[in-house]
Amino acid sequence: MAFDDIYTAGIASGWKVTDASILQKNQTLEADVVIVGTGAGGGTTAEILSQAGLKVLMIEEGALKTSANFKDLDESRAYRELYQEGAGRASSDGAIAILQGRAVGGTTVVNWTASFRTPDHTLKHWADVHQVKGHSPEDMKPWFEKMEQRLNIAPWAMAPNPNNQVLNDACKKLGWEWHVIPRNVKGCWNSGYCGLGCPVNA
């Protein structure tokens, strides 16, 4: 079962979308708040502010794509159209590939849905080294729980494929601790195209 496309539903409910690539003349737009970037951070901020009654304008470098655009699952076109630098972005020394989304929704459109809590040692590091306050494991627990419920985050219940079963068996043999990575999906078809845009909005 495919789920309703949030962009199609949003536009139907009154979202106004302007594709600047086809504008023939300048436009003046008015808003209480302008947010640059429509990924997880920008999208969440826009939701909170709009629910508070503010008029929000979001600016996004990439195009607006819906699940209808992902039906053909054309890999070469997906990389070209949905990723920064055609999925060729990397750290300055070239050692780390940075698969960053370039579309309305940012990297939430093209990711592998891994969703885990910020580790306690990382929160402690932020507090000790960067003096970040109010983000201890105890402080963050209710927020993690809220988002896990909202985003349907849970370990994937499917049996491991043969590749992962080998890793599973090896970890057990070596006495290593292992866990299934929690994912933020609902109704996933296991098509394996998470990085190309989900055709069923899982």
Question: In which residue ranges do the predicted regions lie?
Answer:
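Conserved redox-cofactor binding core of oxidoreductases
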Residues: M1-G14, V129, K133-A202
